[in-house]
Amino acid sequence: NSVQNKIKELKISQKRVVLVINDPCHNPTGYTMSYEEWQKLIDIINEATEDGTPFVLLYDMAYIDYDSRGFEATRKNIRLFQKLNASVLAILAFSGSKTMALYGLRIGAQVALAKEQSVIDEFTPANVFSARTKWSMATNLGMHLVSKVLLTEEYCKKFEIELKQASNMLTARANAFLEESKKVGLQTLPFMCGFFITVPCKNPDAVYKRLVERKIHVIPLENVLRVTIAAISLEECKRLPKEIKKAIDKDL
């Protein structure tokens, strides 16, 4: 297990470990960990911290409310954190910008979980200091909107309906893209849900330029292309795989 081996390596060299997990709807692949994978990860962390080694699990859950499995499945994963050893600090990084589609406001929150109050007492001032010195304050408008929607029953119910509609729309776009990819023979990395689908590519920069000439914009990364299905229509999701495949095949 590569994660387990890396944790052991860092534990020896650093005497402490920080692990960042972006799940569900991983950016950029759309991979999502199963409940069994989360159980295995918790076991690995507990094994590494049996001797009291300080460990921080930073859980980047920016896209958590777009998991196609629904609310209960994602919260069931989080409840596993109760099994973590005392030397583990779990930090949940929530993005209101994603969940509530408030991208321009960049609003989010951190929730720290630990079995020892002393760990939280140490984390809180350090967190406040680092956040205030780097970013000052979150926007008042963003904080107001999040609290207003979540604390007002009428708004909250309407929001839940809109969120479900957005999630269903993403699922439909993803299914269309993946189905068409199979038809044209375009390979994609394992995808479950999310805003992005990733296509393996040996020359991403060259393929990106070819696609731009056809007014198609994807993001070239290392050995892959990231397709943002959150930003394109259902019809475009059906059309893109063929265009991307043609652009990639020019290198063959």
Task: Explain the meaning of each model-derived region.
Residues N1-L252:
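PLP-dependent class I/II
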